[in-house]
Amino acid sequence: MKLERKAEIIAVGSELLLGQIVNTNAQFISRHLAEIGINVFYHTAVGDNPERLKQVIQTAQQRSDFIIFSGGLGPTKDDLTKETIAEVVGRPLKLDDEAFESIQDYFKKTNREMSPNNRKQALILEGSDVLPNRFGMAPGMLLEHESRFYMLLPGPPKELEPMFENEAKPLILEKLGSREKIVSRVLRFFGIGESQLETDLEDLIDAQTNPTIAPLAADGEVTLRLTAKHADPEETNRLLKETEDRILERVGEFFYGYDDTSLAEELAKACRSKGMTLAAAESFTGGLFSSWLTEMSGASEYFKGGAVCYTNELKVSAAGVSEDTLQRYGAVSAQCAKELAAGIRVKTGSDIGISFTGVAGPNTQEGHPAGKVFIGISVKDQAEEAFEFQFAGSRSAVRKRSAKYGCHLLLKMMEK
């Protein structure tokens, strides 16, 4: 079937309209469809009402040739996505034996009795390709009907995301009959804003064809998604590398990793590769930096420990800050940050100590405005350093930005 690649995503569920949950599914699906050259032109949310859902489907049929549904595949009476689509397209629902067996097995394994309405989850549109659900009960499906694709996916992201990546995406490519191999690579940057990055790369972004370059800013970071396509996989990778090299020639100092990595993960890798250990003394960040560094398995190889020194008394007893420093300069100061970093390094026997002291907000402290931050770094046999920042945003944003800058500073230090 010839597909014009005009897609629409319809999220089904009254909880979306009531603001009880955020529609992250539409974002996820749109991003993955863009990677394979399918353009999403419309996002629609509709409640659990068959008449309104019917109207939405009929509108989508007039403007889209690929209609994706998320939600409404459950066992309850208000889960009516399949039934409504079946009525609109004139296809009956039939029991999928494999899906039904999978549901029965689930209840046996969990020693629970299956309700009669769970059988409903194994019903599929006649003539559709079934998308197995490895993380739930309701299967998805892809139906070709009158020059359109209808894809039905479960609502919970933990079910939808693996189903889309592992089952739906390969099937879509097969249906499209494309010989081209589409590959994406995400470059991650920190310490540069989206507007500055786009300015530095303006000519490359304006001239993009293959690969395409898509910037995105989130949580104080900027990513560039490069997407290339070619029948020859080697040529696809060559196109990506050529564009990546041109980008990094200009803004490589801010680059820190690929795809789904994080600053904390890259810092953990750097510590491991250099055989260095780390400890942290945190005030207003409240252990956030330490929690990030210990999310990876085997964290004890590089992270010795830390202390949350919120009060001045603990800054003295847990990290060895002198009372004279606190009286003369205050807790929010470069001097305090240096002593915190040095003290925690010595107390834990680590190679590196890092500290965070500042004002998360919203109130001022010691005459400093909200967002004033000092990050201290102490490296064995080297002089301590302190870095001063003024961040904007909420209390949570200041804490996160500070912890990220701590990772960033240590990564840059290890590159020297």
UniProtKB/Swiss-Prot annotation:
Xref: InterPro entries: CinA (IPR050101), CinA-like_C (IPR036653), CinA_C (IPR008136), CinA_KH (IPR041424), Competence-induced_CinA (IPR008135), MoaB/Mog-like_dom_sf (IPR036425), MoaB/Mog_dom (IPR001453)
Top-rank taxon: Bacteria
Xref: Gene3D superfamilies: 3.30.70.2860, CinA-like, MoaB/Mog-like domain
CDD domains: cinA
PANTHER family named among the record's database cross-references: NICOTINAMIDE-NUCLEOTIDE AMIDOHYDROLASE PNCC (PTHR13939), NMN AMIDOHYDROLASE-LIKE PROTEIN YFAY (PTHR13939:SF0)
Family (UniProt): Belongs to the CinA family.
Protein name: Putative competence-damage inducible protein
Organism of provenance: Bacillus licheniformis (strain ATCC 14580 / DSM 13 / JCM 2505 / CCUG 7422 / NBRC 12200 / NCIMB 9375 / NCTC 10341 / NRRL NRS-1264 / Gibson 46)
Gene field: cinA
